[in-house]
Regions:
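Short amphipathic alpha-helix used as the core "switch/output" element in two-component signaling
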Residues: 65-76, 96
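Active-site beta3 strand of CheY-like receiver
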Residues: 48-54, 59
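Two-component/phosphorelay signaling modules centered on CheY-like receiver
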Residues: 15-33
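Hydrophobic/aromatic residues positioned on beta-strands within the core alpha/beta folds
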Residues: 83-85
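Acidic catalytic/metal-coordinating carboxylates
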Residues: 37, 63-66
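Residue-level signal for the "D+5" position in two-component response regulator receiver
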Residues: 34, 59-62
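Alpha4 helix (beta4-alpha4-beta5 surface) of REC/receiver domains from two-component response regulators
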Residues: 66, 87-105, 114, 118
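Non-catalytic signal-transmission and effector/linker regions of two-component phosphorelay proteins
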Residues: 1-7, 112-126
C-alpha cells in the first residue's frame, strides 16, 4: 500500500527530533519531509501532497494545534498525529482535539520506536 513516493510531513523545532522521526519514516518505506516551524510546514504543503503529518505541539511561531487547524483547511482528510512532551493523552485539550477530529492521534514524548511505526502503518498505509 505504501509507495515510494508517499511522503510524511514532520514538524518539530528540534532538528534531532525531525531526524529521528524522518529515519523511522524512511525505514517504514515512506519519504519524510521536515519543517522546523509552522511557516515552513505551510510552505511545504503548497507543492506537496502529504500522506500524513507528525506535529510537535509547541513550535516557535504557532502551536501545533493551530497548525493542525491550518492543515485541516487544506486537506480535511490528512491524518495528523501530535507528538508532544507538553501534553498528555488524558489532557482535556488533546481529548477535545481527538473528539472533534482536529487531530487523528496523539503520541507522548519520549516515545518508543514502535509507537511511531504503529501510527505510520495505521494512518499512512491506507
Amino acid at each position: 500500500m505504501n509507495d515510494k513516493y508517499a511522503t510524511i510531513l514532520v514538524v518539530d523545532d528540534e532538528p534531532e527530533m525531525c531526524w529521528i522521526l524522518e529515519n523511522i519514516i524512511r525505514k517504514s518505506g515512506f519519504n519524510g519531509m521536515t519543517a522546523l516551524n509552522a511557516s515552513e510546514a505551510i510552505a511545504l504543503t503548497e507543492n506537496n501532497n502529504f500522506r500524513m503529518a507528525f506535529l510537535d505541539s509547541k513550535l516557535p511561531d504557532i502551536d501545533g494545534l493551530e497548525l493542525a487547524r491550518q492543515l485541516r483547511k487544506r486537506n480535511a482528510h490528512l491524518p495528523i498525529v501530535i507528538v508532544s512532551a507538553y501534553f498528555y493523552q488524558d489532557d482535556l485539550t488533546i481529548e477535545d482535539a481527538l473528539k472533534t477530529g482536529l487531530i487523528t492521534a496523539f503520541v507522548n514524548k519520549p516515545f518508543n520506536h514502535d509507537e511511531i511505526v504503529s501510527a505510520i502503518i495505521r494512518y499512512a498505509s491506507r
